[in-house]
Each structure stands twice: as C-alpha cells, then as structure tokens.
Amino acid sequence: MIAGLVLVVLLTKYLQRVFLHPLSKFPGPSIAAVSHLWEFWHDWVKNGTFLEGVADLHRSYKSPVVRIAPNHLHVNDVEVYHQVFKVNTNFYKAPYFYEAFGFATSIATITNPHRHKPLRTTVAPMFTGTAVDGMSDEMYDMVRKATDLLAARSTGTGNKFNVMQFLRCITTDVSCNLIFGETLDLVSNGYHSDRFLGNLDTFVENVWIMVHAPWIAQFALMLPNSLTDKIVPGYAYFREQCISWIDKVRARRAKGITLMRNGRPTLFDVLMDDNPDKNYKVPSKSELIDQAFLFAIAGTDTTSMATTFAVFHILNNPAVRERLCEELRGASAIIRDQYNYREVRKLPYLSAVIKEALRMSSPFPGRLPRVVPPEGMKLDNKFVPGGTIISISSRCIMDDPKIYPEPEKFLPERWMGENAKSMDRNMIAFGKGSRSCLGTNLAYLKMYTMLSTMFCRWDLRLVSPTDHKLRYLDHALIEMKSQVVVEILADHWTT
C-alpha cells in the first residue's frame, strides 16, 4: 500500500510538472521538466558539456527559450540579457547555484544586493582605470622577467613551452601581489614549484559535485581537511592557502605596515579596514577567506585562459599573426624601450585581437542563474512567474551568428568595421550591470601586456594541438583540455 501511495505521489508530481506547471508551455526534454537530471548528465556524467547540450536544445526546438529543469529556463536572447544584467537589476543571483561553490560570501557569489554593494564600493577604487594604469610598470616588469627567463633556457635549437602554464605563472604572481602583497614566485621557480595551481585545477575539475550534491559538500566541509580533500578534491588545500595569506597580512598590519613598497595598500589591507562612508564593516575571518578564495581564482585563470585562446588563434591564422607582429614591432618604442600602457592599448589591431579572443573564450562561459522578480516577466511572448530561475550563457550569445557573423572564425577585423559599436554593446565576456566583473580593467592590462610583449619579441610556431582545434569544458570556469604548446623560432630582443 505504501509503495502504491508513493507511486501515485510521483505520478501526480510528474503530470503536474509536465502538463500543469507554469513552465510547461516552454519546450525542453521531458526529463528536464521533472528533475535536474538533464543538467546533472551534462555537468557531471558527460563532464562539462552543458554548453553543447543547451545549444543543441535551442537548435532542436528552434526556440530562444528552453526548459532545462523543473523551475529553470535557459534563454538565448541578447536583448533579454540586457534586461536582466543591468545596473540596479532586480533579477538577483540564484542562491542554490552561487552559494554552492564553497565561498558563498565572496563578492562574486553573494546573492543579497544590500550586502554586495558596500563590499563592491569599498574595493572598486583599486580596480578603476586610473588605479590599474598605475600598475602597468609592475605588470610589464613581471612579463619581461618571465620572457627573459624563458629565453635564457633556450638552447638555440628552439624553445617549446606550454602557453597556459607560462601565462598562469605571470597572472598568479601579479594577482597574489595585488591581493596579499606577496607572490608564490612561480615566474622565477616554475609552474610546478608550488601546489597552488594543481589544487586549483583539481577543485575546478570537481566543482559540479558542490552544485548538484550540496549536502555532500556541506558535510565534507565539516570534516578534517584530509577527509574533505577526498570528497571535494583541492578545496581544503586551497582554503588553507587563503588562510595562510590572510594571517600573513594580519601579522604585517600588526607591525604597523599597511602599505606596500609601491605606496599602495593591498586588496586585503582595504578589506581589513572599516569604511563608514561605504557602510562597510570588516567581516568575519570566514568571510575574508571567501574573498581570498574568489579573488585568487579570478586573478589566476580568467586572463591566462583568454590570452591562451588569443595565442592559439593568432598562430593558427598566419594573416592575423603577420599583421599583429607588424603592428607591434612598429611600436617597439612603447613596448620594449619604455613600456607605455596608455599608448599600447591604443594599437588598433592588438585591441581587435584581444576583443576577438575574449569573444571566443568567455572565461565564465556557462549559465549564470538569476531569479525572476515577483512581478514576473515575458519570454518569447509567454508569461514567466516570479521565482522562476532563468539562465543566459555568454558562450551562446558570443556564438550567435546574428550578432557575430561566422562566429566560429577568429576575425579581429570584425571589431574594426562599421558594426563595431553594436558588437561592443553585446561583448559580455566580463558581464554587464551591477554584478559585472570588478577586474575588467586589470584583465585588459594583463592581456595587452602579455600579448604585446610576446609577439613584439618572439617569432612563434604552434606545436600543438596538432589538429588545430581548441577543446575546453564548462566547469563554471573554462577548463582547458587542449594543451597549447608553442616554439620560439626567433627572439628579436636578443639579436
């Protein structure tokens, strides 16, 4: 009898979700109407293939809106994106998703806008255009040091290196210095000299377990680190590293040292001071650890990944490579002789290459769930009630041929034509609105400096991937599956 009652309840729930639910008017697979198994299948079982799966749904159903879970719609419409992702939006981040990653109170994952605003306005001055311009000499010094060390290892018969590993050493050291006032010395000692990046990779590889089985993750975080690491690999070490950094900042501040040698405070010096004007109070240590976790991830992988995409596509397109190298070598006075970031970022073809690389990489490529406000909204001329979760993936927008013709091709020239302004409006690599990426200016500084130095200095050849295809997975961040390896054929700064 109990089994029969359970069957009736399940059947009733099935019929309600498939036929009577407010979202039943939207197309999608039946399994998505009754459970979260469609998302789980692509995220976990098929390992980060959500983007491929959702793109197939939009094509198969010929609809800009598809149902991917009982109360969750995926939207592929750039105008809806601008409606949702705007300043003072009332489409708030969905707690089930953002609070699951293990750093729920960070500036990127906190869902309450009233808690987010004081935090953002307090740290935002560190990331303004003027503030970032002031970091350009330090950024160039780090890139120059990295390229000098790599060139010194050349035997004269060619020097091959993994682009992503090389760039991550730079971005990690730069970001850690900005955030905490110290580096891991990866540029000097090499990619494998510290466990930090390996544990970050392990955490990202397993991140979906925290979203789809949050109770497992919550249980794991209550255990000793050795056991936590078996359930959520990489997380415990990464958090330990963040604690160590914070403790060092506190110890330094206890000695009265609140500014670095460059005369600027670190990000954590700012976070460790109350700011009554911004209604900001120093949070608990646990919340500070969440901030460290987020900023360390964001500063390490996003720009190194986008720049790796750029290097691959530049070398995979001889005409692009030749035009870029010609522009950069003609500007060696502002790159090699005396680096001038303000002038470098005015270089038109380099700027176009960077925009196209960002379009094709989208460091946060997948769904960014938001909660529909109480008054509801219309999608595809159908009413969607408040409380519904809607997602829009930047990768789908960036691959839309109506916005970017021939989106599969790397075409920097598209950013130099008459449609550049409209395309700029739809460039969403860093998000839009109140919750857009705080580090956009810093990301551009890193990309401009790394690419201008590498291609002004070196003649490079693409060694792998040999099939000239770049493969990646959606693990919230892009996880690179292709190893981009290049060879230095000539060094124009040592001849």
Curated annotation (Swiss-Prot):
Subcellular location, principal: membrane
Pathway: Secondary metabolite biosynthesis
UniProt-annotated binding residues for heme: 437
GO CC entries: membrane
Cofactor(s) listed in the protein's UniProt record: heme
Deletion consequences: Abolishes the formation of aculene A and accumulates dauca-4,7-diene.
Gene3D superfamilies: Cytochrome P450 (1.10.630.10)
PANTHER family: CYTOCHROME P450, CYTOCHROME P450 12A4, MITOCHONDRIAL-RELATED
Protein name as catalogued: Cytochrome P450 monooxygenase aneF
